[in-house]
């Protein structure tokens, strides 16, 4: 029987085999492809260039804003500043209007102006076989060579912090794409609040990263996206070769987000989670970093600790220590599959 892959990220085991064969022979490539590595890094002389490419596939609303912020988040995890964007727009045949194209591009331009990013190129076309727009961004950032942070930097004893909570992005997408299914459980004001998770608490983590890095010794950062926090923890563990021990009860899940997930029967820890930033911080600096974020009105929780390898993620509670399951796909994909 043919093995058909589910919607979502390519399984880590397959991806790992594929990436192991990638030709990366240029000595200027300091960080190439790998599980849990948000960006590539290239030595450009005085500074390092950081590269990221990411699509928007689930959402159909505010696509341009999503695109810029999702790519900027990954650049932020390296301590770099996002600088230059290229975007590709694949638009559905028979549905695309000039107003649609202008709307998406206007959103991209507005988000780039807000983050001081220059749009330097890209591609757009009307494409056969699509039922909705698919857009892809490639973002380049810049960081001084002595300030680079990668997921490989997590060390035993570091504290594991999470900003804002989860799943911010899933909450916004579900409220925007399936309002009729939520209207039976949420009053109009709550539904509007869930829709506005796109901007409050927001999908961007560039500010979170800047504050954290300025406040203490951040050793690694990772951006939870598809597969949610659970997948992000596993990716960070694999990238660093460390074991992560968390208390699942410490994970901040906003009440409204939990209710939205409950309507669809989703695990909040396994749903797309842009807007949160996962950090490992030197133990002696963890309180200082957390307080700096909280003073900036950014929720920050201490989830647990980094331990020696081998790579793994463990839930530690009063009942004992169990391995945290790694999701096979993103919870939100099930909802789109039902629609």
Per-segment meaning from a language model:
Residues 8-163, 168:
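Glycine-rich phosphate/pyrophosphate-binding loop regions near the starts of catalytic domains
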Residues 32-34, 42-45, 78, 112, ...:
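Solvent-exposed alpha-helices and their adjacent loops that cap or buttress functional pockets
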Residues 274-280:
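A short beta-alpha structural unit
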Residues 3-6, 10-15, 296-339:
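Acidic, Ser/Thr/Pro-rich beta/coil linker or hinge segments at domain junctions
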Residues 31-34, 224-225, 243-252, 270-272, ...:
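Beta-strand->loop->alpha-helix junctions that form or flank phosphate-binding loops
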Residues 281-287:
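Helix N-cap motif at beta-to-alpha junctions
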